Design a protein with these regions (language model features):
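C-terminal non-catalytic interaction/assembly regions of soluble proteins
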Residues: 1-42, 330-455
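N-terminal phosphate-binding or glycine-rich loops at protein starts, especially the Walker A/P-loop
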Residues: 2-34, 82, 86-133
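Glycine-rich oxoanion-binding loops at beta->alpha junctions
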Residues: 52-87, 133-181, 218, 229-236, ...
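Gly-rich Lys/Arg/Thr-decorated short loops/hinges at beta-loop-alpha junctions or inter-strand turns
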Residues: 88-96, 131, 149-159, 216-226, ...
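Short glycine-rich or small-residue beta-strand-to-loop segments that form or flank ligand, phosphate
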Residues: 92-102, 157-160, 181-187, 213, ...
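Short glycine/serine/threonine-rich phosphate/pyrophosphate-binding segments
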Residues: 102-112, 135, 166-171, 189-197, ...
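Anionic-ligand anchoring segments at beta-strand to alpha-helix junctions in alpha/beta enzyme folds, i.e.
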Residues: 110-157, 364-369
Length: 455
């Protein structure tokens, strides 16, 4: 029997997700041949330029015994187009960072500037200070390649950032007043929801302004795309905290090292840090509820582990167990300027509960809990090599998309290839840990922790 006799042909339909374009409301825009054609650093070969027919399939894995792949959703592939909708001499680009810090922010800013400057010959590039409010309350900073040359070696964001300050009319009025015709927005889910409103208002006013977003969330909780920039750096840096907790726990009788990692609504950092470390005895994430007392609870598991090894390491994501922590009425109402509920410190609470448990069940026996919270250390570091490269590809993808006339989109990888995704589709998505996925099973097989499902 030949190999061909084992092949079964499948027919599928591809549904291309529509991407907003400037010509949707400005149909008479003139096109230009891309400056890349005459750029000394580029020698375009066959396949270098992409077209409308270049797409990326969103879903690539199927169980053919259960689901027939009758249709696929596809997105436009990111990359340079031969015909663009901007004259390089007339581009005025604005770049803004919003929300919390994340490794790689300065790399994204740098590469937006370098990409616009070196690839497309743009000279009017401006940085918006301190987030969305900077559009209307502060003077912009003129950027050039010399200024941003070493920014990728710095943590944080040189442009500064803040939460809140979103005033739609003031922001779009400022975009008009300053004459920006390209706006690059770097931020997380709250920022992306704001970007959708900015894009819709620009479209309503029929302004010649392309809007692109680069998703930023160290928690890796933005949906559709493979991952967010800064995530791999965060997992790498979390190893130091876990190693320190392990040393502390090993160095004391009945020692427990407790590490709180970032992850408001999802436990990706905790999960990947646990898999990478192999020093973790229990990983607690928001997607998998746990309980403290009784059969199959956390305390029973830790008691057995302390009897076996004399020490244990627990990693907990910051959004875990929030409904278990007592709150005052005032605490129940608190939100930050982005509208996110302010979480209580699960690490402080869990440390206290561990000590209460031990004092009741093992009064007089030695016991130590060392709590490590590396949150601000992790998010403030410079990006590692992998994230630096990733930020470069994201930035250049966004530039190529805006130059091609696309607008209201997010640049990001899908199945390892870069695509343009409509902002309104991605803004309200969440990438959460699937506790039925093999990766979570790997965590439990390594730690041997219970599933915390009450019988």
């Amino acid at each position: 029997m030949t190999d061909s006799q084992h092949i079964e042909n499948l027919t599928i339909n591809v549904n291309l997700v529509r991407l907003p374009h400037l010509t949707d409301y400005l149909p008479n825009l003139q096109t230009h041949t891309t400056p890349l054609e005459h750029n000394n650093f580029y020698h375009p070969s066959n396949g270098f330029y992409l077209s409308q027919s270049d797409v990326i399939i969103r879903r690539t894995i199927y169980d053919l015994a259960r689901t027939a792949p009758s249709s696929h959703f596809a997105y436009h592939r990111a990359g340079p187009r031969k015909q663009i909708f901007y004259d390089q001499q007339n581009v005025r680009a604005a770049i803004v960072t919003c929300g919390g810090l994340c490794p790689g922010l300065n790399t994204v800013i740098r590469e937006l500037v370098v990409g616009l400057w070196e690839q497309y010959g743009v000279r009017e590039i401006f940085g918006i200070k301190a987030g969305y409010r900077g559009f209307y309350s502060m003077d912009p900073v003129r950027l050039d390649v010399k200024m941003v040359h070493n920014w990728h070696k710095r943590g944080g964001t040189v442009l500064e950032t803040s939460r809140g300050g979103f005033d739609l009319d003031k922001i779009v009025n400022a975009i008009q007043d300053y004459g920006y015709n390209q706006v690059y927005i770097i931020g997380g889910d709250g920022t992306l929801r704001g970007a959708v409103k900015i894009f819709n208002e620009i479209r309503r006013r029929k302004l010649y302004v392309g809007v692109a977003a680069i998703p930023k969330t160290v928690d890796n909780d933005v949906g559709i795309i493979d991952r967010s920039f800064g995530f791999q750096t965060a997992v790498e840096k979390a190893q130091q905290a876990i190693s320190a907790a392990h040393v502390e726990a090993e160095s004391a009788p009945n020692g427990i090292g407790l590490v709180k990692l970032m992850g408001r609504s999802t436990g990706h950092i905790a999960l990947y840090a646990t898999l990478s470390s192999r020093d973790v005895d229990c990983c607690l994430i928001p997607e998998n509820e746990f309980y403290l007392h009784g059969k199959g609870g956390l305390f029973e598991f830790l008691e057995d582990r302390l009897k076996q090894n004399g020490h244990a390491v627990v990693v907990v994501a910051e959004g875990t167990g929030q409904d278990m922590i007592p709150r005052t009425n005032a605490e129940k109402q608190v939100s930050d300027e982005s509208g996110n509920p302010v979480f209580l410190d699960v690490g402080v609470w869990l440390k206290s509960e561990l000590k209460k448990w031990w004092d009741v069940d093992h009064k007089g026996e030695l016991f130590t809990v060392k709590y490590i919270d590396p949150t601000y250390m992790i998010r403030a570091v410079t990006a590692n090599a992998t994230d630096n490269l990733y930020c470069t590809l994201l930035s250049h993808s966004a530039i190529h998309g805006v130059m091609a006339g696309y607008t209201g989109f997010v640049a990001g990888p899908i199945n390892g290839n870069y695509a343009y995704i409509p902002m309104d589709e991605i803004a309200d998505t969440k990438n959460v840990v699937d506790t039925k996925d093999p990766k979570w099973a790997w965590v439990r097989s390594i730690t041997t922790q219970p599933d915390f499902q009450r019988n």
